[in-house]
């Protein structure tokens, strides 16, 4: 809740008062089976001063307990236009409609209980679940049962819909609209109003085990406990033959994709790219033989660095991978032990039902759920691990990404308050403007060839950025552009389409008329000033655009991009050592986790895993639809399991397509084409589940090996040790995958005369 709104509320409401947010009249307690003993009252939601959504009170007050003034307030709220009021109230506790004229309905704070049990009140944070019993045959009145966190038994609340003015009014309106159903498509009744109102202030999740039970602000374990175990579909006949197979997910796609490969051998030769001409002279012979293949050129045409990598590093990655294979190869004995312990090759599953259930995907965090995670001062009320668990397994709704991403990208500390974040926001704006002025006000700097080259690279890529998004659809370039962001170029209405790449030389790429692309250019030029050693490299626009679209604020986007680039900088180093190290680690991971597939890739001469270069470079930005990319990135930013979880996601892509590759592909170009064609045809959630299962298996395999080494040392001291190479070895690169810290690798100082990119 914003601080200024808290102050206004504090002036209006004392500590012994609450504001009524919702009431439902003619709700009853049935203390006995006799109708004459029924107790009529009001079921309500109310908020005290400085109360966050989790502190909102659910209460039942009997009519006899209310004064005449309070009774009038309860009646007014009951028959008010609930939908409009709740829309105005749900965001942080604002007390007015857009006009600011709404009167507060202030009443005395409900007591916790009465001597006769005729009332109760409980904060939302104390409610574990609510069982909703709709009116039906045998249950003339619908009712709700509130289950508390500590198991306290509260009276059952019955809804006498035939007496309630608000229910009768709403039912009449629905009948006039010929729509007697509630928002969820079920028959309307009074309890629907209460649950809808509660959903404005709390995360209400329907249990998949018992449909009548709704969990209130559930934690991850609550949802798992109320979800059925998932039974992976695995063919028993393949278990012994395929010991490293995870449960198949989305295989129907891979089967269909094979038809595309029937024409793979009919590729026609194409003219080599100029960049390939330059590197071809020094490329190893095996590379020269594949450098002209269309699928290689397809990747190379997108990123110049991909061509350089292929010519300079691909062969070395193969050689080092082979060396690692010899040095760290696990023998059959340890693999058999691992398989036996993990249940592979027997009648048991690789992972338990509980472990598989924990990997299930959840709904994205909604705005209501997100707001419920903070107290009245804006501080997180759950642990960082808990919120990262929730984001990892569900992601975020788009409406809260603009706030949540600032935490994930370490722009805002997780333990900060709303007031502290406001102060930080102002300091970020000032700091950004100071860095930007270093190039805006320096005519000499802008006249240097290096700066001009960087600017041209940025502008050329900016004009190609996510042209399918309406926010980036460009206008025709016709006039001279400004230097800073104060003054946009003159524009005229024209085709909204961004020019095709083939037309790049037909217009002035520096004349960026789209205001959003213009701001992105300013951000990248300012980042160039901030990180002078790295400079601009092709592919950075792919990383920047999702951030800008989410924040649409120049300074916030800049600092989010700075922090994102801290972990991504190794992808853009001049010597490409960062990409080489990742490809080598992925290679070792495939050997370790999918040994049979790796052996097949050796036969296909594909162990350099070149088809993953683009995927790793820009974190699968070209492999998924826009919304899926946003979901994937926020999940990777959590570092929930590993600071390099993107490598397990890449491993999941291979694992998901292992059968097709092993059974049908036998050449480098076939494998490359097949993997390239997976773009825009993969199921994100299925791959995330598979990646998580692969990581859990990887971690258990490491544990088993470490335990075996410890037992050898314990039982035979002096015989087994690291010096005589008698212990089972795991490479440092694989062990580093267990760390939750992202790998940071910075560019060295730029040598004089060396250009950017």
Curated annotation (Swiss-Prot):
Pfam families assigned to the protein according to its UniProt record, in alphabetical order: RabGAP-TBC
Keywords associated with the record: GTPase activation
GO cellular component: late endosome
Domain Rab-GAP TBC: 395-640
Region annotated Disordered, chain positions: 482-507
Coiled-coil residues: none
GO biological process: regulation of vacuole fusion, non-autophagic; vesicle-mediated transport
Biased segments, Acidic residues type: 498-507
One term of GO molecular function: GTPase activator activity
Matching SMART domains: TBC
Function field: Most effectively accelerate the intrinsic GTPase activity of YPT7. It is also active, but to a lesser extent, on YPT31, YPT32 and YPT1. YPT6 and SEC4.
PANTHER family, per the entry: SMALL G PROTEIN SIGNALING MODULATOR 2-RELATED, TBC1 DOMAIN FAMILY MEMBER GTPASE-ACTIVATING PROTEIN
The protein's name: GTPase-activating protein GYP7
Originating organism: Debaryomyces hansenii (strain ATCC 36239 / CBS 767 / BCRC 21394 / JCM 1990 / NBRC 0083 / IGC 2968) (Yeast)
Upper lineage: Eukaryota, Fungi, Dikarya, Ascomycota, Saccharomycotina
């Amino acid at each position: 809740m914003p601080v200024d709104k808290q102050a206004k509320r504090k002036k209006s409401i004392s500590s012994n008062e609450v504001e009524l947010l919702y009431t439902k009249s003619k709700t009853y307690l049935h203390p006995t089976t006799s109708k004459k003993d029924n107790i009529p009252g009001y079921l309500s939601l109310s908020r005290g001063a400085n109360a966050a959504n989790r502190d909102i009170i659910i209460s039942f007050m009997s009519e006899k307990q209310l004064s005449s003034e309070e009774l009038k307030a309860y009646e007014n709220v009951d028959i008010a236009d609930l939908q409009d009021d709740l829309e105005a109230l749900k965001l942080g506790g604002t007390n007015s409609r857009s006009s600011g004229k709404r009167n507060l309905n202030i009443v005395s704070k409900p007591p916790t209980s009465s001597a006769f049990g005729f009332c109760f009140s409980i904060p939302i944070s104390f409610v574990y679940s609510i069982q909703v019993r709709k009116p039906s045959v045998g249950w003339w009145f619908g009712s709700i049962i509130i289950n508390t966190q500590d198991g306290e038994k509260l009276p059952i609340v019955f809804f006498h819909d035939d007496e309630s003015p608000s229910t009768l009014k709403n039912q009449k309106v629905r009948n006039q609209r010929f729509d007697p159903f509630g928002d969820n498509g079920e028959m309307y009744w009074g309890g629907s109003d209460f649950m809808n109102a509660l959903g404005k202030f709390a995360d209400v999740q329907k249990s998949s085990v018992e449909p009548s039970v709704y969990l209130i602000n559930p934690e991850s374990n609550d949802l798992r406990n109320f979800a059925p175990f998932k039974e992976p579909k695995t063919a028993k006949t393949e278990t012994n033959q395929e010991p490293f197979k995870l449960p198949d997910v989305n295989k129907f796609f891979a089967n269909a994709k094979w038809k595309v490969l029937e024409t793979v051998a009919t590729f026609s030769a194409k003219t080599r790219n100029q960049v390939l001409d330059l590197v071809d002279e020094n490329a190893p012979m095996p590379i020269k033989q594949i450098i002209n293949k269309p699928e290689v050129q397809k990747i190379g045409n997108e990123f110049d660095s991909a061509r350089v990598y292929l010519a300079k590093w691909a062969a070395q990655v193969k050689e080092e991978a082979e060396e690692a294979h010899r040095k760290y190869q696990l023998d059959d004995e340890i693999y058999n032990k691992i398989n036996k312990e993990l249940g592979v090759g027997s009648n048991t599953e690789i992972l338990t039902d509980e472990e598989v259930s924990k990997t299930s995907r959840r709904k994205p965090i909604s705005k209501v759920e997100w707001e419920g995670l903070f107290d009245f001062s804006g501080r997180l009320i759950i642990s960082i691990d808990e919120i990262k668990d929730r984001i990892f397994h569900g992601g975020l709704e788009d409406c809260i990404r603009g706030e949540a991403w600032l935490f994930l990208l370490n722009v805002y500390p997780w333990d900060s308050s709303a007031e502290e974040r406001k102060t930080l926001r102002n300091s970020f704006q000032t700091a950004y403007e100071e860095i930007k002025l270093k190039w805006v006000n320096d005519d000499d700097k802008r006249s240097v060839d290096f700066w001009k080259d960087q600017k041209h690279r940025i502008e050329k890529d900016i004009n190609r950025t996510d042209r399918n998004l309406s926010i980036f659809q460009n206008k025709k370039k016709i006039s001279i552009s400004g230097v800073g962001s104060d003054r946009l170029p003159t524009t005229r209405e024209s085709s909204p389409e961004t020019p095709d790449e083939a037309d790049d030389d037909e217009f002035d790429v520096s004349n960026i008329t789209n205001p959003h692309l213009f701001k992105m250019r300013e951000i990248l030029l300012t980042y160039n000033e901030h990180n002078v050693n790295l400079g601009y490299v092709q592919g950075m626009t792919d990383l920047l655009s999702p951030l800008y679209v989410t924040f649409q604020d120049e300074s916030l986007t800049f600092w989010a991009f700075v922090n994102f680039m801290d972990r991504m900088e190794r992808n853009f180093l001049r010597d490409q050592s960062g990409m080489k190290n990742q490809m080598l680690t992925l290679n070792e991971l495939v050997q370790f986790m999918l040994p049979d597939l790796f052996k097949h890739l050796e036969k296909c001469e594909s162990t350099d895993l070149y088809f993953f270069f683009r995927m790793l470079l820009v974190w699968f930005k070209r492999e998924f639809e826009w919304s899926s990319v946003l979901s994937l990135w926020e999940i990777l930013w959590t570092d929930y399991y590993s600071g390099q979880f993107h490598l397990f996601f890449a491993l999941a892509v291979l694992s998901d397509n292992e059968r097709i590759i092993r059974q049908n592909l036998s050449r480098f170009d076939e494998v490359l084409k097949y993997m390239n064609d997976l773009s825009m045809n993969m199921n994100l959630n299925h791959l995330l589940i598979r990646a998580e299962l692969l990581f859990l298996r990887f971690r258990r395999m490491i544990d088993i090996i470490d335990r075996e080494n410890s037992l050898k040392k314990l039982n035979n001291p002096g015989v087994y040790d690291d010096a005589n190479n008698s212990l089972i070895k795991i490479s440092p690169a694989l062990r580093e995958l267990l760390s939750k810290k992202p790998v940071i690798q910075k560019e060295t100082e730029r040598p004089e005369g060396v250009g950017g990119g």
